[in-house]
Amino acid sequence: MTSGDKETPKREDFASALRFLMGGCAREPEMTAMAPLNLPKKWARILRMSSTPKIPIVDYLEAAESGNLDDFKRLFMADNSRIALKDAKGRTAAHQAAARNRVNILRYIRDQNGDFNAKDNAGNTPLHIAVESDAYDALDYLLSIPVDTGVLNEKKQAPVHLATELNKVKSLRVMGQYRNVIDIQQGGEHGRTALHLAAIYDHEECARILITEFDACPRKPCNNGYYPIHEAAKNASSKTMEVFFQWGEQRGCTREEMISFYDSEGNVPLHSAVHGGDIKAVELCLKSGAKISTQQHDLSTPVHLACAQGAIDIVKLMFEMQPMEKRLCLSCTDVQKMTPLHCASMFDHPDIVSYLVAEGADINALDKEHRSPLLLAASRSGWKTVHLLIRLGACISVKDAAARNVLHFVIMNGGRLTDFAEQVANCQTQAQLKLLLNEKDSMGCSPLHYASRDGHIRSLENLIRLGACINLKNNNNESPLHFAARYGRYNTVRQLLDSEKGSFIINESDGAGMTPLHISSQQGHTRVVQLLLNRGALLHRDHTGRNPLQLAAMSGYTETIELLHSVHSHLLDQVDKDGNTALHLATMENKPHAISVLMSMGCKLVYNVLDMSAIDYAIYYKYPEAALAMVTHEERANEVMALRSDKHPCVTLALIASMPKVFEAVQDKCITKANCKKDSKSFYIKYSFAFLQCPFMFAKIDEKTGESITTASPIPLPALNTMVTHGRVELLAHPLSQKYLQMKWNSYGKYFHLANLLIYSIFLVFVTIYSSLMMNNIELKAGDNKTMSQYCNMGWEQLTMNLSQNPSVASQIRLDSCEERINRTTAILFCAVVIVVYILLNSMRELIQIYQQKLHYILETVNLISWVLYISALVMVTPAFQPDGGINTIHYSAASIAVFLSWFRLLLFLQRFDQVGIYVVMFLEILQTLIKVLMVFSILIIAFGLAFYILLSKIIDPQPNHLSFSNIPMSLLRTFSMMLGELDFVGTYVNTYYRDQLKVPMTSFLILSVFMILMPILLMNLLIGLAVGDIESVRRNAQLKRLAMQVVLHTELERKLPHVWLQRVDKMELIEYPNETKCKLGFCDFILRKWFSNPFTEDSSMDVISFDNNDDYINAELERQRRKLRDISRMLEQQHHLVRLIVQKMEIKTEADDVDEGISPNELRSVVGLRSAGGNRWNSPRVRNKLRAALSFNKSM
């Protein structure tokens, strides 16, 4: 058999199965021969597993496109999922059938539940494709199903939009038969309906079909507010407009009414046509009855719009077609009271201006701001229009609402005064021009003021030549020279000074008493200042008593300060009416560079009338930049730090309290290194402690009497104590502070501390020895019962052995209670005397501290521990001084407390040592947390203790474990011990349960289970978590705590030590040579370093060797870059000067030659705004208000 013969039975089986299925499906009464085949899964699997070869997708889609239904069916039944297959364009079989008008394929796809709303890559459905391909039968079939007619493609077009845009008239007619399934008012892109598209593309037939067959309404606007008739007018769609007119006439609406429809902005179609700039559309609107005098919402007519656009052809057309409306339009004004002539003048359209004036427009009409077309053209730099209007006889004396004439606007906008003057002289009179020269506006400024302000050199020169007065003052009493000085117009100033009256105006003052020299100095225009000084400007003061150098210092212009000082050095220390020097004013304005320059010049550090220095203002307003410039000055820093402060005894304490970062810079400056290699033996590090010592301490002065309120006695370690008070960890951890404490420690601290520790250790030893001897030298004395004397006379060991053998005798002894007494040996008496002497001496010291510290002493827990220790120790040693040596339970309790607290206080002593002290600090911090937590959760201990007392106190045959629940106090203690894990579950609960002695076993076990969950598990883990968290916080604050303890230690010592002796051991500076071989350590230092680790290890303190290596490198690199920038700037200035000389030599005229150097008014306003708003992060509005108030301080404050 051949391979074909082998496959024959398989094909027959497949064919018979298929015939059976087809027959069964056809026999169903509700299904036809074309009904979809709902094949069972096993038959579908048989079909897929048959040897039928796989057919490409292209063949399947080509079958749909060709309309061959048999092939399409065969391919579909081979794989039902092929109905959703798409080609490269995203088109399905339904798209292909619709494109080729294959209704049979579409009908079969519908029978197979195909998707007719599927989109291709362009977003088109089969309905879009049918419209685009003129497949009318397919279109009719799809609409009859019906399919979704509102699907939008990528261009936001529904099928009806697409048919209208492509002018598919026949397709629209087919769609009109199914208008009930089509939303004709559906919006596409920008909300445009199909009627909008017909108007835009002028498809009149489409528009007619949409109106007649679809009942489309032309009164439906798009999202932009335009009606279809506006779109037709804008796009000159005359045929479509005619359709709209006919529709309106059929409904009783005239053409004039149709052409007068307003859009959202109040535009009629004629406005839209003018906006579009198409003269045909305008002509169409005019022929349709549109009025050129129709106003939109802003009251502008189409003539206004055409004049603003410069469309003279449209203007002429409108006037020619509607001559009766011309006069009305020429005088019609918009919301700004502007006529069409204003619009044409504003946008510099001289041809339209000439035409409008020829047609009778009012050449001197005024708008809302009283501007004529001439003023409006001049304000918008329309110089062609300006000259034309002058030639046409426009009035040049008209002023606007701000009283500015045309000459003001010519100067302000950079017009050529020579051309303007020539036009006025030729067309009008020279006298009229003379009147304009010195006229003032509402601010009192003449054209010469504006020429000086804006730096128009040529205009200024022409104004002076024409006879303008150079000493006119505005409302602020400012002359043109003041304006030129304020804006840095060097050449303008020179021209004004070279004029006839130049020598008379150089020293004139404005309303604030400021001369041009004051103003130029305040604005930092160094060249202008130099020019004024060379021309003989006098050094007057303004109304606040300030000289030019003070104003330059306030603004921070260092070059101006140096120039003024080089000419008039006596200005440096002059004061204003409030007693402020230039340094005060520069500090108030936070100008660090000016402060550095002034201090380098040698300015005096004086106080103003409020008795405040410059550093006081920097501290008061919290200006770190200003303070840093003063306290880190190379030469004058010591003088600044020596000044007294208004609120603090000295500047150092004020900086620590208010500006720690600034004082950190002071500390950095106090550490200097030798100028040699760091590995050299001669390399040293010098620490200066002058600012930490605070040698300049001043008393507070009573303002009324002038006497000292407090004595100016030296305060121990004032700087370090202030750091501790304000929590300045970074300052305490600074190498200078640590080295300062190390100097104190090495000078006297370690000796006194070790001596104190040694004395306390002796007391501790005697307390321990006494307690041991007391317990070993107790004797028993019989009471009144003489029968028990034989037992009482025995020693403790013999008595214990006898009592263990005779329990009845032991109970009798307990009942009769023998008296106990101590054997007063010499050792016990000696120890008791030493203890008493120590306690008496320390009690006197504690009483002195109570007198000094008062309430603060009581709040210290350590002091309470000390008093309890002293009292318990005295009670403990009392039997040693009694004749009979009697001892009772009180003495036992006192002895136990004294021994415990004495050793506990030794632990507190160790917290001042660095290596072990940190652990003591952590222990105490966690102890505080534990006490707080236990105070809160003691509620649970009481709750469970009472519950266990009720459940376990009444056991019939109690075991020893149940005795702990016999009363409430014992039950609470037992509950607390159970919290630590001592449950004894078997003995307390299990044995009792199996002996049936638990009264309520279920309740007992329930409460026990709750207890085990809440107390040993939950509460103990909570305590551990809190402890870990507190350890982290303690580790973060350990540095401050350790250093604070050292500060407190040295402060207490210095309060008690003689001042003369302290002056002898203190050092103002310390020099270390880190590379030299260290000498042999002393015994004390060796012990401390070995066991306690000296609080100031050499390794940590030596880190300062390289603490500013990077800073030095960065500073050097920055200085090098600054020098390069200065050189580049200098070279650019030289090249700019040479280029100007070349241009002048070659007589090249440019617009730049007409503008003087300096800054523009807008730039000056922005700079002033930044200064007023705070140019840096330290100038908040609140601080700026305070600063302004400070400038006018008086003594009454």
Swiss-Prot record:
Gene3D superfamilies: 1.10.287.70, Ankyrin repeat-containing domain. GO terms for molecular function: calcium channel activity; ligand-gated monoatomic ion channel activity; monoatomic cation channel activity; temperature-gated cation channel activity. Residues 1-753, 849-856, 911-932, 1026-1197 are cytoplasmic. SUPFAM superfamilies: Ankyrin repeat. The keyword Manganese does not apply. Residues 775-827, 878-889, 954-968, 990-1004 are extracellular. Coiled coil: none annotated. GO terms for biological process: calcium ion transport; cellular response to heat; cellular response to pulsatile fluid shear stress; detection of chemical stimulus involved in sensory perception of bitter taste; detection of chemical stimulus involved in sensory perception of pain; detection of hot stimulus involved in thermoception; detection of temperature stimulus involved in sensory perception of pain; detection of temperature stimulus involved in thermoception. The chain crosses the membrane at residues 754-774, 828-848, 857-877, 890-910, 933-953, 1005-1025. The keyword Transport applies. Disulfide bonds: none annotated. Residues 969-989 dip into the membrane without crossing it. It is found in: Cell membrane. Glycans are attached at residues 785, 802, 823. Disruption phenotype: Eliminates avoidance of elevated temperatures along a thermal gradient. ANK repeats lie at residues 89-118, 122-151, 155-184, 190-219, 224-253, 265-294, 298-327, 336-365, 369-398, 443-472, 476-505, 512-541, 544-574, 578-607. Homotetramer. Essential for thermotaxis by sensing environmental temperature. Receptor-activated non-selective cation channel involved in detection of sensations such as temperature. Involved in heat nociception by being activated by warm temperature of about 24-29 degrees Celsius. Belongs to the transient receptor (TC 1.A.4) family. This is Transient receptor potential cation channel subfamily A member 1. The gene is TrpA1.
